[in-house]
């Protein structure tokens, strides 16, 4: 049984479909928001924080612990980023890695696979965040 089958088995189908639709929005926008960090830092950090906060809440409800813990980690980094005036290259690179991880899990859910492990490079947090 893949992860999508498990989600439908354990939750109302409307909730699962809403979760996938919400994730579609994240996938469509996240890289553009990361790119905007260089030109509109404060608004972009706030938007990224909202994205990962929403993902954290949804995955907690659906009991997707791996994604939930990861979303909390990114949210913590972004909370620290809110205290800064600009993004470092290291932060931007790390956020693109985080985006890639989210996209990989999105693909695995949509193809009803098991969730892969987190990319180990993401465990090295950007300095100062």
What are these regions (language model features)?
Residues 1-129:
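Non-catalytic helical tethers at domain boundaries
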């Amino acid at each position: 049984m893949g992860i999508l089958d498990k989600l439908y088995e354990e939750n109302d189908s409307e909730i699962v479909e809403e979760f996938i639709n919400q994730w579609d929005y994240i996938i469509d926008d996240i890289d553009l928001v990361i790119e905007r960090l260089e030109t509109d830092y404060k608004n972009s950090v706030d938007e990224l924080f909202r994205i990962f906060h929403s993902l954290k809440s949804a995955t907690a409800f659906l009991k997707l612990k791996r994604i939930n813990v990861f979303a909390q980690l990114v949210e913590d980094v972004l909370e620290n980023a809110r205290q800064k005036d600009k993004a470092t290259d290291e932060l931007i690179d790390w956020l693109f890695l985080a985006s890639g991880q989210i996209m990989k899990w999105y693909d695995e859910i949509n193809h009803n696979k098991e969730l892969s492990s987190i990319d180990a490079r993401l465990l090295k947090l950007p300095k100062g965040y």
